[in-house]
């Protein structure tokens, strides 16, 4: 009986560990600051499964522009970065992170394009992705929603200023405000 | 105790009703027939929640083109169609359905764009959407995945043949092969 009880507790603990999620808000920018969004209801929820080394992320937009594609990405703050993050390719200069300046802040980054939030007639949409297994490490990152879809991916619009610009960032409010994600 | 058992049974039955899902395969076309896809592992899973009148659809692509955007949509076979399907726009704006000829078959359709499957370095990707509440009725429809993203949505590629064409249809294999979905 004691053994069964211990097993149940262990199972419960592992479920809790795998599903402990962090929720964070979007903020405006880092390129566009007038794109509509309900900042109270919009959010990003992410969690790490330490057993599978997988990162789950759900992007939720509420009250954005109706019937629009927002490509969602992670920007890693780094000096060098591997060619992939989980099953997604990274955008670097042969492994070296690329220096960009936004909101007067200059930092070296590697970008990973994860997918697209498509909004409905109310400007609402969600997109969920499971990334991994991810190489163990501590990652300093910022989530971004671009003003369109196509950068670094086949079949979308051109990766020009109109489509690539950051409409929303998280955490923010300034480029370089970061979230730390640890993959054990 | 008997009352508790009955309540539990009712709860279980309602959960079962809401989550009964249909799985169907993709087939090639109806425009492009050379786009790579593991037709055995790729699928669409859909279910109707009769209580909320919501339709849940998951599009899964396996071994498609890596790092590509596939916009997923529904073609309804109809004579007239409302301006919206749940919270998504009818591309034709509502009213009379529009004749479309593919694979030698001509049918009147209304199209609704639901979102985007983004593939990873292996050509795998999935996208889930919950549509509704949907007007009660019986819908004859075919799912399809376009060769890019942007048709009838802001922020993607232009809706030219390169991006609008259907790479995959379901059920198929011929345009007009339909799935019937009933919203009570």
Residue ranges and their predicted role:
Chain A
Residues 20-184:
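N-terminal leader/targeting pre-sequences
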Residues 1-4:
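Positively charged n-region of N-terminal signal peptides that target proteins for export
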Residues 7-15:
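Bacterial N-terminal signal peptides
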């Amino acid at each position: 009986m004691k053994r069964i009880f211990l097993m149940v507790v262990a199972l419960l603990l592992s479920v809790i560990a795998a599903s402990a999620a962090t929720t964070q808000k979007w903020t405006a920018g880092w390129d566009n600051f007038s794109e509509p969004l309900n900042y109270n209801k919009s959010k990003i929820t992410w969690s790490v499964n330490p057993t599978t080394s997988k990162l789950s992320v759900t992007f939720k937009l509420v009250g954005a522009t109706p019937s629009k594609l927002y490509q969602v990405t992670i920007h890693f703050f780094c000096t060098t970065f591997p060619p992939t993050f989980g099953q997604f390719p990274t955008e670097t200069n042969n492994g070296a992170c690329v220096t960009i300046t936004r909101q007067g802040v200059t930092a070296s980054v590697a970008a990973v394009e994860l997918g697209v939030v498509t909004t409905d007639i109310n400007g609402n949409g969600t997109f969920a992705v499971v990334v991994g297994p991810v190489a163990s490490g501590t990652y300093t990152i910022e989530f971004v929603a671009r003003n369109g879809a196509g950068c670094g991916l086949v079949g979308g619009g051109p990766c020009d200023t109109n489509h690539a610009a950051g409409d929303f960032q998280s955490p923010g409010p300034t480029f370089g405000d970061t979230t730390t994600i640890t993959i054990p | 105790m008997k009352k508790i058992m009955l309540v539990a049974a009712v709860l279980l039955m309602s959960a079962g009703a809401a989550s009964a899902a249909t799985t169907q395969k993709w087939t090639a076309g109806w425009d492009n027939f050379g786009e790579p896809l593991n037709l055995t592992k790729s699928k669409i899973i859909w279910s109707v929640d009769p209580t909320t009148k919501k339709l849940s659809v998951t599009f899964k692509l396996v071994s498609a083109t890596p790092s590509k955007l596939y916009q997923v949509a529904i073609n309804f076979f109809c004579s007239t169609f409302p301006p919206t399907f749940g919270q998504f726009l009818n591309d034709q704006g509502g009213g009379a359905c529009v004749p479309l000829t593919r694979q030698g078959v001509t049918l009147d359709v209304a199209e609704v764009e639901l979102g985007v499957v983004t593939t990873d370095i292996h050509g795998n990707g999935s996208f889930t959407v919950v549509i509704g509440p949907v007007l009660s009725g019986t819908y004859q429809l075919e799912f399809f995945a376009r060769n890019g993203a942007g048709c009838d949505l802001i922020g993607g590629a232009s809706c030219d043949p390169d991006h609008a064409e259907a790479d995959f249809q379901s059920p198929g294999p011929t345009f007009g092969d339909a799935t019937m979905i009933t919203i009570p």
